[in-house]
């Protein structure tokens, strides 16, 4: 049994770039050593054998907890999911093998969150967890320093590549002649994710739809259902001035 035990458990709470990241790990390392758990109730997940979808129901969360006990090391790709935070808060002995992979927004919630009783309680839980982590994986050393300053953590710092870098692909985009081009190109978002507030941005830009603008939406990553919704709304609002990038 010990021989088949997964060494490294990756827990994702944010879906951008997941497929490419998983493919990169499986291609360059032994896939049998890695298990990827994605905490989501929506969208499809990678169909690889070492990828599982974990929903909010009790039985799924039991699977998550079981895998957290079985593995050697845990990589937390984002510290936002409240159920994951509660699991770690009430089972703090798991923190000694947890490494937080900083996404950015999960660190800066310290500054960006709206003050309320629930928000304060949420931050108390996060503070306890971050303070007692084994390691923090951050591409930017300053992010690690901020985590130490804000959360008084003694976690070790581990340098890592920025998510897209190892899975970089070149894509051919049309060249724009700035001298003769009469349009202003506006990029909205960088993935099909509700957190990027595409619809709100569309509303603000709608009053300019008859001007010389073109809207470009990169939607190669993220949720399929949300992607379709954005494409439909973009075409309805901007017509042939709306462009998408759905494949890389």
Protein language model regions, located:
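Short beta-strand->alpha-helix junction loop in the catalytic core
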Residues: 104, 142-143, 158-173, 221-222
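Membrane-proximal helix-turn-helix segments that form the acceptor-binding/catalytic region
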Residues: 65-70, 116-136
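Nucleotide-activated donor-binding/catalytic signature segment of Leloir-type glycosyltransferases, i.e.
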Residues: 228-248
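Active-site proximal beta-strand in glycosyltransferases
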Residues: 73-75, 92-112
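Acidic anion/phosphate-binding donor-loop and adjacent secondary structure
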Residues: 1-3, 162-183, 195-196
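Conserved donor-binding/catalytic core segment of Leloir-type glycosyltransferases
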Residues: 10, 175-196, 202-205, 215-217
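A short, active-site helix/loop in glycosyltransferases that binds the activated sugar's phosphate group
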Residues: 126-158, 166-168
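Short N-terminal targeting/anchoring amphipathic segment
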Residues: 10-11, 63-84, 97-99
């Amino acid at each position: 049994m010990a021989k088949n035990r997964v060494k490294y458990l990756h827990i994702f709470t944010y879906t951008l770039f997941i497929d490419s990241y998983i493919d990169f790990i499986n291609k360059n390392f032994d896939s049998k050593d890695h298990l990827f758990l994605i905490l989501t109730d929506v969208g499809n997940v990678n169909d690889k054998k070492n990828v599982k979808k974990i929903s909010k129901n009790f039985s799924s969360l039991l699977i998550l907890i079981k895998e957290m006990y079985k593995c050697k090391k845990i990589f937390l790709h984002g510290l936002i999911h409240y159920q994951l935070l509660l699991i770690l808060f009430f089972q703090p002995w798991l923190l000694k093998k947890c490494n937080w992979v900083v996404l950015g927004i999960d660190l800066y919630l310290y500054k960006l969150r709206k003050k309320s009783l629930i928000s304060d309680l949420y931050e108390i839980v996060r503070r306890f967890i971050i303070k007692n982590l084994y390691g923090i994986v951050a591409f930017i050393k300053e992010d690690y320093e901020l985590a130490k300053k804000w959360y008084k953590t003694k976690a070790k710092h581990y340098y890592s590549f920025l998510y897209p870098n190892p899975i970089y692909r070149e894509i051919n985009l049309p060249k724009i002649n700035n001298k003769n081009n009469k349009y202003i190109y506006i990029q909205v978002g960088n993935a099909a994710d509700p957190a990027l507030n595409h619809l709100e941005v569309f509303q603000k830009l709608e009053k300019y739809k008859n001007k010389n603008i073109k809207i470009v939406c990169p939607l190669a990553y993220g949720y399929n259902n949300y992607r379709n919704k954005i494409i439909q709304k973009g075409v309805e609002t901007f017509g042939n001035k709306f462009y998408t990038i759905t494949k890389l």
